[in-house]
């Protein structure tokens, strides 16, 4: 990472740029009177979305371009380009920064932004957000109408809280459980890790568990999809720290602490009992297939991947519950990871391109666009007004409607509901938003996630070599030498 950043900065110093590049001509924001209506303005938007999501984005782009011509008399063209996946997206943008032809706007994760900041390529948004003509509606104290924890992620890059991104598509992790099994054995939906372990122990006494074992299948009480997320969340829930800033404002790796070690030793204990397993144990990237094959009664995974945890043959009903917490945790102590991306504006020599890049970001995340995006994708609302809207509340109500849009009524005169795990995820997942945490991002913080994942694998699947203490020490040494 250090070698890459050094090369990136050297290349930036050598290159000359034509449009968007890391060295702007000025920090001024164009007044409406300074906008040149005689030229076409092209805004490039890099992202990693698939074909279905690109259709939604293009619909929003078409409306934006029409609106900009009506409002400012400018022919704006937004060119969206999918890089296919997030790793390729990050690498492509990093290379384009070095070459001086970065996009105007991009979909980003926090660790992406921290990398781009090393190249001095990211535009701070504070001046645009507060601008009298182009700024966001609402108040800073209300996160400008965005869900608070989502908005806060845009200002985690320095101690001053400079805003470098705004929320775009968001998800979290939830507990999926086999509702048929829970009903059969009278198990209550777990709220704490103690509850989870109690069900794991009861699971081992069931016919389904024995059948799976007799068939040579790998089993467990609860499956964990993302080992990296689990590493961070356990540390957060046990009251420890994962990353942060030191006294000099420099990024620091902080997971060598008693709380982190207690959390990881608990995990080793429960793994050795056959209660808690990860996708590595199952030999897969995700636990969903094992869950659907009744090798696990519970699994923790992304809300955006809910459909993968629903059996297509209808063999059982998938229940959805909040992420388990430590027993006795207060509301302030509860922790759940927030996932998903933001959008970021890059420094541009052409200040008109930069301005309309910002206006595109603003339009992409306004009420109408955010509502359209939410209703047509599996992602959460990022705005409070979208979450409270009649359209969204109708969508998640699970009430059946007739062709004329009226609710179907049952014999008791009440609306008929049909359980939908995908919509239930929206309700359960977003209800966790007060507990969402965000880890600070800085150059090298992405490597900490990789090391966290490796720690989980070492302490669970290579116990002869790695204790919790050794795994942490080796990880910190690797990060220091990177």
Regions found by a protein language model. Name each.
Residues 31, 110-172, 213-215, 234-236, ...:
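Hinge/lid segment of periplasmic solute-binding proteins
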Residues 126-146, 213-214, 220-222, 240-262, ...:
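Short, solvent-exposed loop/beta-turn-alpha elements that line the ligand-binding surface or hinge
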Residues 1-42, 473-482:
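Short, low-complexity disordered leader/linker segments with a strong preference
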Residues 70-149, 180-191, 288-290, 297-298, ...:
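Extracytoplasmic "Venus flytrap"/periplasmic binding protein-like
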Residues 153-168, 173, 197-252, 268, ...:
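Extracytoplasmic/periplasmic solute-binding protein
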């Amino acid at each position: 990472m250090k070698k890459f950043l050094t090369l990136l900065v050297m290349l930036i110093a050598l290159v000359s740029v034509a449009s968007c590049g890391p060295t702007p001509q000025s920090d001024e924001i164009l007044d409406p009177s300074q906008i040149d209506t005689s030229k076409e303005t092209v805004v490039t938007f890099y992202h990693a979305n698939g074909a279905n999501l690109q259709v939604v984005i293009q619909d929003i782009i078409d409306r934006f371009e029409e609106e900009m011509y009506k409002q400012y008399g400018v022919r704006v063209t937004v060119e969206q380009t999918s890089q296919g996946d997030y790793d390729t997206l990050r690498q492509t943008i990093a290379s384009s920064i070095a070459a001086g032809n970065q996009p105007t706007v991009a979909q980003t994760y926090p660790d992406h932004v921290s990398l781009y900041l090393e190249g001095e390529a990211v535009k701070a948004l504070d001046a645009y957000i507060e601008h009298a003509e182009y700024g966001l509606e609402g108040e800073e104290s209300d996160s400008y109408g965005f869900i608070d924890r989502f908005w806060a992620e845009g200002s985690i890059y320095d101690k001053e809280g400079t805003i470098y991104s705004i929320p775009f598509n968001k998800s979290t992790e939830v507990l999926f459980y086999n509702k048929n099994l829970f009903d059969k054995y009278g198990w209550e939906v777990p709220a704490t890790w103690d509850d989870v372990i109690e069900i794991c122990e009861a699971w081992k006494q069931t016919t389904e568990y024995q059948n799976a074992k007799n068939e040579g299948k790998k089993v467990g009480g609860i499956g964990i999809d993302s080992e990296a997320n689990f590493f961070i969340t356990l540390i957060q829930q046990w009251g420890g720290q994962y990353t942060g800033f030191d006294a000099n404002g420099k990024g620091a790796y902080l997971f060598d602490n008693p709380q982190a070690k207690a959390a990881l030793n608990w995990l080793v204990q429960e793994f050795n009992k056959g209660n808690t397993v990860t996708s590595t144990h199952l030999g897969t990237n995700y636990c969903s297939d094992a869950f659907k094959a009744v090798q696990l009664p519970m699994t923790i995974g992304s809300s955006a991947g809910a459909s993968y945890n629903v059996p297509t043959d209808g063999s059982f009903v998938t229940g959805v519950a909040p992420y388990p917490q430590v027993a006795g945790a207060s509301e302030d102590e509860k922790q759940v990871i927030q996932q998903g991306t933001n959008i970021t504006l890059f420094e541009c020599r052409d200040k008109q391109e930069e301005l309309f890049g910002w206006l595109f970001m603003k339009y992409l995340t306004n009420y109408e666009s955010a509502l359209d995006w939410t209703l047509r994708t599996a992602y959460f609302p990022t705005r409070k007004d979208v979450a409270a809207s009649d359209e969204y509340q109708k969508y998640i109500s699970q009430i059946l409607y007739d062709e004329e849009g009226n609710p179907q009524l049952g014999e008791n005169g009440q609306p008929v509901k049909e359980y939908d795990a995908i919509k239930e995820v929206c309700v359960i997942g977003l209800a966790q938003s007060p507990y969402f945490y965000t880890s600070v991002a800085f150059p090298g913080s992405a490597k900490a996630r990789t090391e966290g994942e490796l720690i989980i694998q070492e302490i669970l699947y290579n116990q002869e070599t790695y204790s919790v203490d050794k795994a942490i020490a080796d990880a910190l040494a690797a990060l220091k030498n990177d």
